[in-house]
Amino acid sequence: MPLLDSFTVDHTRMEAPAVRVAKTMNTPHGDAITVFDLRFCVPNKEVMPERGIHTLEHLFAGFMRNHLNGNGVEIIDISPMGCRTGFYMSLIGTPDEQRVADAWKAAMEDVLKVQDQNQIPELNVYQCGTYQMHSLQEAQDIARNILERDVRINSNEELALPKEKLQELHI
């Protein structure tokens, strides 16, 4: 099985909250696509609660678009990581990490302004696969934590696992 890009970085040295360019590529028509690792939690030390990350998934996607789309950038998708330590964001364009960090912080401010669970987009049986598994309070706790700690930049060069270590770990 091929080694995915996300597993070539040392998760024991990853900071959080932090932005990292996980991958860049071009479409056959030459459009740049960038995938960002938006790391909310320190891997193997913290984890977002399932109800909170689910609610955040519903809110974060729209709020990030409000703050990041434009000037050559259009978000394709924002999805939670299975390990519940962050989100992957795929977009058209190549914004720098600081622009993404600023949009992320603004989106977290927006999450804190949501006053009622009824304001969560697509929170119904028709548009959500587990519409009863939500917590606005947990999502706001996550947002507050991000804003209190600020958002840093994780560098691929600093986090790269040495080739020898990758060979040792590869099954």
From Swiss-Prot:
Acetylation as UniProt keyword: no
User: What EC number(s) does the entry state?
Assistant: 4.4.1.21
One GO MF term: S-ribosylhomocysteine lyase activity
Which UniProt keywords are listed?
A: Autoinducer synthesis, Iron, Lyase, Metal-binding, Quorum sensing
Substrates-to-products reaction catalysed: S-(5-deoxy-D-ribos-5-yl)-L-homocysteine = (S)-4,5-dihydroxypentane-2,3-dione + L-homocysteine
> Bound how, and how many: what does the cofactor note say?
Binds 1 Fe cation per subunit.
Presence of keyword Metal-binding: yes
**InterPro entries linked:** LuxS_sf (IPR037005), Metalloenz_LuxS/M16 (IPR011249), S-ribosylhomocysteinase (IPR003815)
Entry cofactors: Fe cation
* Ligand binding (Fe cation): H54, H58, C128
Q: Which Gene Ontology BP terms does the record give?
A: quorum sensing
Question: Pfam families of this UniProt entry?
Answer: LuxS
Family affiliation: Belongs to the LuxS family.
Free-text function comment from the UniProt entry:
Involved in the synthesis of autoinducer 2 (AI-2) which is secreted by bacteria and is used to communicate both the cell density and the metabolic potential of the environment. The regulation of gene expression in response to changes in cell density is called quorum sensing. Catalyzes the transformation of S-ribosylhomocysteine (RHC) to homocysteine (HC) and 4,5-dihydroxy-2,3-pentadione (DPD).
Q: What quaternary structure, including any partners, is listed in this protein's UniProt entry?
A: Homodimer.
The protein depicted here goes by the name S-ribosylhomocysteine lyase
Lineage per the UniProt record: Bacteria, Pseudomonadati, Pseudomonadota, Gammaproteobacteria, Enterobacterales
